[in-house]
Amino acid sequence: MGPSVSVSERKRQAIAAAALTLFARDGYERTSVDAIAAEAGVSKRTVYSHYGDKENLFLLVVKDTYELMRERFAEVVERTLTDVDDVEKSLVSCIREAIATVSQSPERSTLIRLVLTELPRFPVLMDLWRNRAILPLLGAPIARLAAAGLLNADDPDQAADHLSALTLGQVNNRSMMGTVPITDAETDQIVTSGIRVFLCAYGVRRD
């Protein structure tokens, strides 16, 4: 049984979820604190006590959602790319799961729509995006695989960039950043073919 969550924390989570939904649906300008409070089932005063004002609420909700995506990705990478025997199988498992739990998650689709809409109003969103990018999380496990003689990657970060472009990037393009559904078969084809191309460049050839 997990740790109990305080009433205050439950209210904060409800406010954040309501704010993300309403900001994405109605835009920052048209979303009122009254509407967020009503959606969350709390008082307007409670919203202000947790987040200060609407702008601070908006930025914190975006930051927290970015962080949630990053934590999910890190957990997938750690679980699937530790103690690797079959590199291709492990990479396919990692990327497939990352797509299912991160790239195509409802939260990410909502976040992408929100950021693209509000970026002109809040240029700081680009900094939040860069500072919490998930791509660097692939560099360390690729370095470990290279050190173990399972990959030939002199520059693990560049290899991570290539792996992402061939798999996650292609899925993002096909699904318009997770806002348009694509089939599991399409996703599998992109992932498996992308990883095979990646291994043509970075795989260790066995004689």
Regions found by a protein language model. Give the residues of each.
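Helix-turn-helix
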Residues: A14, A18, L22-N56, L60-K63
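Hydrophobic alpha-helical connector segments
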Residues: A74-R108, I112, A159-A160
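Short, basic, alpha-helical segments at the C-terminal edge of helix-turn-helix-like DNA-binding modules
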Residues: K63-M69
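Amphipathic alpha-helical segments used for helix-helix packing
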Residues: V102-D127, N172-M177
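Hydrophobic/aromatic-rich alpha-helical bundle segments in the mid-to-C-terminal region
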Residues: A146-R196, R206-D207
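N-terminal intrinsically disordered/low-complexity leader segments
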Residues: M1-R10, F73-A74, D154, R206-D207
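Short helix-capping/turn signature of helix-turn-helix
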Residues: Y28, Y51, L114-F122, A133-I134
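Amphipathic alpha-helical packing segments from all-alpha helical-bundle domains
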Residues: Q104, T110, P123-A148, D157
